[in-house]
Amino acid sequence: MDSPCLVALLVFSFVIGSCFSDNPIDSCWRGDSNWAQNRMKLADCAVGFGSSTMGGKGGDLYTVTNSDDDPVNPAPGTLRYGATRDRPLWIIFSGNMNIKLKMPMYIAGYKTFDGRGAQVYIGNGGPCVFIKRVSNVIIHGLYLYGCSTSVLGNVLINESFGVEPVHPQDGDALTLRTATNIWIDHNSFSNSSDGLVDVTLTSTGVTISNNLFFNHHKVMLLGHDDAYSDDKSMKVTVAFNQFGPNCGQRMPRARYGLVHVANNNYDPWTIYAIGGSSNPTILSEGNSFTAPNESYKKQVTIRIGCKTSSSCSNWVWQSTQDVFYNGAYFVSSGKYEGGNIYTKKEAFNVENGNATPQLTKNAGVLTCSLSKRC
C-alpha cells in the first residue's frame, strides 16, 4: 500500500473529499449517520440518464473477505465470485483491500459494488472491470488505478454463460459494452494503460457522477467508433465530476448519441477538455473550465474529422451557464430542438458554473466511518 500511485490516490482523495457538499446526489444520502444500516438507499439517489439504475437493491448483502482472484473458478468470499452470480447482490467489503485481477472481471446484472467504509483498490498492474450485455450495475466508492492490458485467457463471465475465452484487452479501468442502466459514482480513477471509462456499443442510460479523474491522458470515451452509428441511441449524463489534476483529453470524447455534461470542474488540460466526432449532441451546462497557460490550448472543445470549417457547423454543441478561467472558451454550434432531455425522474437542478467547485469538492472516494455521515 506504499506505491507512488497509492500514495497519490490517498492524497488527492483526502484533499478533494475533506468537506461536505450539497449536490443533489450527495444530499439524498450523505447526511444519514446510519448509512451503513441502510446502504441500499443509495440506489434511490442517482440522477440523469442512469437514474433508474437499481444495482443490487432488494438482493442479499455479499461481503468480500478475500482479495484473491481466480478468473475461472472464483472462491466464495472473493469479489469475482460475487460479481458473477446470477442474482441481485449488494457487494460490500470487510476491510481495506488491494485487488489485483488476473484477467478482466465481468459483472453480472443487478449488482452494486459499494466500497463505503473501506479503501478498496482494483488494478495495481492487473486488468480491470467490464460491464457487458447486462443492466443495472452501480459502481460506488472504489479506487480504479494502474489497470493494464490483458492476454488471451478463459474467464467466468457469469453463472449462466459460464467460462468463455476472452481476447486481450486494452487496459481500460472500466468498460461498458451494450450495457444499460449503469451508475458510476464517487470513484477515483487514474494511471491506466488506455482509458479510464469507455461507454460503447449501444450502451445507454448511464450516469457518471462525483468521480475524481486524475493523472491520466485519455479519460473518457463515449461511442465505439465512427463506423458504428448504432451509438446514436446512447444517452450519458456526466455530472459533478472533478477532472484533474493532470488530465490530457477526452473529458469526454463522444461519438453519436446525446451527452449532458453538467456541473463538472475542469483543471487545466494538456490537449482539450470536450471533444467528439460523428455528430454527437453535447450539452455543456454549469461547468467550470480553467484553461492551461499555453495560448493554443485555450479552446475547451475539439471537433474531430471535419473536412472543412463549415462541415461540422450543424453539430449541436451548446454551452449554457458555464464559466471560463485563464482564457478558456467553448465553441458552440447548432441548435438543440429536442425539448426536455430528461423525464421527470431523471431531471435534476443544474447550478451556474460559479457553484461547481462547491458541488464537486467531494468528488472521488469518500471517507466513510460507521455511525458517522460520509
Swiss-Prot record:
Disulfide bonds join 28-45, 128-147, 306-312. Binds 1 Ca(2+) ion. The keyword DNA damage does not apply. It catalyses: Eliminative cleavage of (1->4)-alpha-D-galacturonan to give oligosaccharides with 4-deoxy-alpha-D-galact-4-enuronosyl groups at their non-reducing ends. Glycans are attached at residues 158, 191, 293, 354. Pathway: Glycan metabolism; pectin degradation; 2-dehydro-3-deoxy-D-gluconate from pectin: step 2/5. N-glycosylated; contains fucose and xylose. Its EC number is 4.2.2.2. It comes from the Eukaryota. Residues 1-21 form the signal peptide. The keyword Lyase applies. Optimum pH is 10. One of its GO terms (biological process) is pectin catabolic process. GO terms for molecular function: metal ion binding; pectate lyase activity. Keywords: Allergen, Calcium, Disulfide bond, Glycoprotein, Lyase, Metal-binding, Signal. Belongs to the polysaccharide lyase 1 family. Amb a subfamily. This is Pectate lyase 1. It comes from Cryptomeria japonica (Japanese cedar). The lineage of its organism: Eukaryota, Viridiplantae, Streptophyta, Embryophyta, Tracheophyta.
